[in-house]
Amino acid sequence: MSEYLLLLIGTVLVNNFVLVKFLGLCPFMGVSGKLESAIGMSMATTFVLTLASVLSFLVNQYLLAPFDLTYLRTMSFILVIAVVVQFTEMLVQKTSASLHRALGIYLPLITTNCAVLGVALLNVNEQHDFLESAIYGFGAAVGFSLVLILFSAMRERLAAADVPMPFRGGAIAMITAGLMSLAFMGFTGLVK
């Protein structure tokens, strides 16, 4: 039980996919302008990442590995991710049209979010079992969501602040992301 908790904490805080592994930077910078969009993107990404992680494990374990088709791993994982994203987009469109409009192009772009594919491939490389794959996917999603929501709140606060002209926009966003990354480095010794 403690092994699973350590995996979850390690994935969320210590090995955060955005701040440590630099995966998922496109939606991190693109959707973080408004807190409402960041929360919606976080929920959608959490759902997609967790489900894609589990389904990718199943595809690898019961389809690719037994038939020695591991060379198709990346392509099959991308297909699984695309199906999960399409399902999520239909679900969001039916349940919340305003959220669907707010997310705009970023919802279909979850398909190309390298963090989603990275989690699926790292699950295979680290030889996680089914439960570990689910926890790893969920932890990566929670870590992504945590960083995205915190960063979005900071960007909204910075938009109201008196930032010098050369630092406005992307420059102050990159400085803020760097400071967040330094703050998350404090968790490094938490999990071995």
From Swiss-Prot:
Complex formation: The complex is composed of six subunits: RnfA, RnfB, RnfC, RnfD, RnfE and RnfG.
Pfam name, any one: Rnf-Nqr
Keywords: Cell inner membrane, Cell membrane, Electron transport, Membrane, Translocase, Transmembrane, Transmembrane helix, Transport
One GO CC term on file: plasma membrane
NCBIfam families assigned: PRK05151.1 (NF003481), rnfA (TIGR01943)
Keyword RNA-binding attributed: no
Cellular localization per UniProt: Cell inner membrane
Function per UniProt: Part of a membrane-bound complex that couples electron transfer with translocation of ions across the membrane.
Membrane topology: Multi-pass membrane protein
GO terms (BP aspect): electron transport chain
Transmembrane segments: 5-25, 39-59, 72-92, 102-122, 134-154, 171-191
Family to which this protein belongs: Belongs to the NqrDE/RnfAE family.
Protein name: Ion-translocating oxidoreductase complex subunit A
Organism: Shewanella amazonensis (strain ATCC BAA-1098 / SB2B)
InterPro entries, sorted: Ion_transpt_RnfA/RsxA (IPR011293), NqrDE/RnfAE (IPR003667), NqrDE/RnfAE_oxidrdctase (IPR050133)
Main enzyme class: translocase
EC identifiers of the protein: 7.-.-.-
